[in-house]
A protein has these predicted regions:
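Short, small-residue alpha-helix embedded
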Residues: 48-49, 203-206, 267-291, 295
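Phosphate-handling active-site elements
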Residues: 56-60, 253, 284-298
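Glycine-rich phosphate/adenosyl-contacting loop at the front of the ribokinase-like
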Residues: 1-80, 122, 266-270, 331-334
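A gly/proline- and charged-residue-enriched helix-loop-helix capping module
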Residues: 91-95
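Short alpha-helical functional segments enriched in proximate histidine and acidic residues
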Residues: 81, 284, 305
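Short alpha-helix plus adjacent loop in nuclease-associated cores
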Residues: 96-101
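Ribokinase/PfkB-type carbohydrate-kinase core domain
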Residues: 1-14, 66, 75-90, 102-256, ...
Length: 334
């Protein structure tokens, strides 16, 4: 039987995105232009991105929520994209995890203030790959964000279970402190078939400086991918950066693809750019696209995501993303 679909498991939060005029120093004032509410967290964002891109396969969410207004808003937001939330676990009496995202209009950068809530109560049982599932991929995120899973080797347990149930595995990260990444991620890598990270995460795990002064080093990014494969990643390792992305397959295939040139006037925020990139990669990997095209769709989806301060609202169908990228042109390549 041909496998179809992606199960996305891990931390899901309600993102409360404040678009602010600038980042204030302590004891000074900044103004909020507007506030938007949307479900967030790597599994949700990747799933919403897949559906916005036009994925034709099932996209299922495994996560936790509290029985509160935050949870109701979060799940309604997830369903609005078409995500299957029927397997989200409701934890009675718990606060739904939520994050205040401060997105600066003058820089496009964002800062996060998180209430961990029910994600600190999440266990392996909440995220276990469904028995009998015909899903092709199991995506998990993110080490360093769920206390019980961090302390119990839960991330490895889940990846191992997914493989035993016939799924390919992916692990996505969040910008947690580098020492947490170095502790939690390497033991997971031999259980990951696909592992795609940003320049900060790649540097934290491999010790290779992928970007200097904001500029991507293509050679160093490729070296980081090769080291991740040497650390155990099964089939593909990738590194993405605002200037482009690099991926290396275990069979030796290498792809280096520059990112899309997006005018500063078009950028409303970069909250979901990394997750949008991963969504594009996941769609291509699920559908067995050539590696260059996987990276191109990841870059194009990330570029479109910049048009909204929320994570997924401005992502377009996959063909429209690629057309947008073609119309804007690419940054200088390697």
């Amino acid at each position: 039987m041909t496998r179809q679909g992606i199960v996305l498991a891990g931390i899901v939060v309600l993102d409360i995105v404040h678009l602010i005029d600038h980042w204030p120093s302590e004891e000074t004032l900044a103004f909020i232009d507007r506030t938007e509410f949307a479900a967030g967290g790597p599994p949700h964002n990747a799933g919403a991105g897949l559906l916005k891109l036009g994925a034709s396969f099932p996209v299922t969410l495994l996560a936790t929520a509290g029985d509160d207004a935050y949870g109701e808003t979060m799940l309604a937001s997830a369903r609005s994209y078409g995500l299957d939330t029927s397997q989200v676990s409701i934890i009675r009496g718990a606060i739904t995890s939520h994050t205040h995202v401060m997105s600066c209009q003058d820089t496009g950068r964002r800062t996060f203030f998180a209430q961990l809530g029910c994600n600190n109560l999440m266990t392996v049982e909440h995220l276990m790959p469904p028995a009998g599932s015909n899903a092709k991929l199991y995506y998990l995120g993110s080490p360093g964000t769920a206390r019980h899973l961090d302390e119990s080797d839960g991330w490895r347990v889940l990846l191992k279970a997914a493989r035993e149930r016939g799924m390919k595995t992916c692990l996505e990260l969040c910008p947690v402190p580098a020492d947490a990444l170095r502790k939690l991620v390497p033991p997971c890598l031999p259980l990951c078939d696909y592992f795609v990270v940003n320049d900060y995460e790649a540097g934290s795990i491999t010790g290779i400086e992928v970007a200097k002064g904001g500029a991507l080093s293509w050679a160093q990014a490729e070296e980081a991918c090769r080291k991740l494969l040497a650390m155990g990643v099964g089939e593909l390792a990738g590194v993405h950066h605002p200037y482009g992305a690099v991926a290396v397959r275990r069979n030796g295939e290498v792809s280096r693809r520059p990112s899309v040139k997006v005018d500063a006037s078009e950028i409303a925020g970069s909250t979901g750019a990394g997750d949008a990139f991963y969504a594009g990669m996941l769609m291509g990997l699920h559908d067995d696209w050539p590696l260059d095209r996987c990276l191109d769709l990841g870059n194009a989806a990330a570029a479109c995501s910049l048009h909204s301060p929320t994570t997924s609202a401005s992502i377009r169908r996959w063909d429209q993303c690629l057309s947008y990228a073609e119309s804007k042109g690419l940054r200088p390549g390697p």
